[in-house]
């Protein structure tokens, strides 16, 4: 498996995301640049320029017309995907940590950090009503007083969002009323990443407590646990097989004191049902910060602390692989 190396960032990658068809790959890092690439050959299509700080999150809507980014420059920006033009700018009082379009692409949500005396908020804007963005008045703002949100995604059909917190809690907030629908605490430390399955029935969380866990989207029932020896920064579910890929490594501050071999900077593949590890892919010099499966399941990408994004196309053996139960 020879990866395609994407070199478009000077700082460590924070998130990578495919659009729905998978022909484009969006990458953001701790530099102000937002890149978009052709996933088939790794050619850079262009950049979205305007942010002045690290970009924490990126999302594309259902038909890839718009791109949403959230940054540490205290802003969330909406871009025209094709032209790279900035369509909207929402100012916030602290850094934007997570962002996402709902199923229809009409409503955006983003969460802000708890910093500089400001509380953590989840804001919802309806793009069909331009006055909300112009006046910086979301139709709904949910405060999170106890523990800040470190990762959040839309649930099925845009009815609620699923949020993971710094203290390991998971909860659902209704996108209509803003009330908390349910709350569970299965992780002991911060939840770094949440990704849903292709059909939005389940989602996987990646946590600092060295595990990734699978949950039901609607009931938040805990289904499976994938254990490693290192903090898990990101986890993704294969759209075609019962496979999970985990990316991690140790804390960024400990990286320079260990050799690459001890660092465990591999992407690790687990079987979804049996919770068994069956493969590893080496490559990054440093922890993996974000992983994503291509929507057709034939390739996956990883973005690392080294600032590189690697696109891996699976070998034919991968598709013939039968798991021995």
Swiss-Prot record:
Which Pfam family, an example, fits this chain? Answer: EIF3I
Q: Which family does it belong to?
A: Belongs to the eIF-3 subunit I family.
Q: Give the main localization category.
A: cytoplasm
Recorded GO cellular component terms are: eukaryotic 43S preinitiation complex; eukaryotic 48S preinitiation complex; eukaryotic translation initiation factor 3 complex; eukaryotic translation initiation factor 3 complex, eIF3m; synapse
Q: Which InterPro entries match?
A: eIF3i, WD40/YVTN_repeat-like_dom_sf, WD40_repeat_CS, WD40_repeat_dom_sf, WD40_rpt
Highest rank taxon of the organism: Eukaryota
Transmembrane annotation, as ranges: none
- Protein name from the UniProt record: Eukaryotic translation initiation factor 3 subunit I
An example GO BP is:
translational initiation
Keywords from UniProt, A to Z, are:
Cytoplasm, Initiation factor, Protein biosynthesis, Repeat, WD repeat
Query: What quaternary arrangement does the UniProt entry report?
Result: Component of the eukaryotic translation initiation factor 3 (eIF-3) complex, which is composed of 13 subunits: EIF3A, EIF3B, EIF3C, EIF3D, EIF3E, EIF3F, EIF3G, EIF3H, EIF3I, EIF3J, EIF3K, EIF3L and EIF3M.
Record's subcellular location: Cytoplasm
WD repeats by residue range: 8-47, 50-89, 144-183, 186-225, 283-324
Q: So what does this one do?
A: Component of the eukaryotic translation initiation factor 3 (eIF-3) complex, which is involved in protein synthesis of a specialized repertoire of mRNAs and, together with other initiation factors, stimulates binding of mRNA and methionyl-tRNAi to the 40S ribosome. The eIF-3 complex specifically targets and initiates translation of a subset of mRNAs involved in cell proliferation.
A GO molecular function assigned to this protein is: translation initiation factor activity
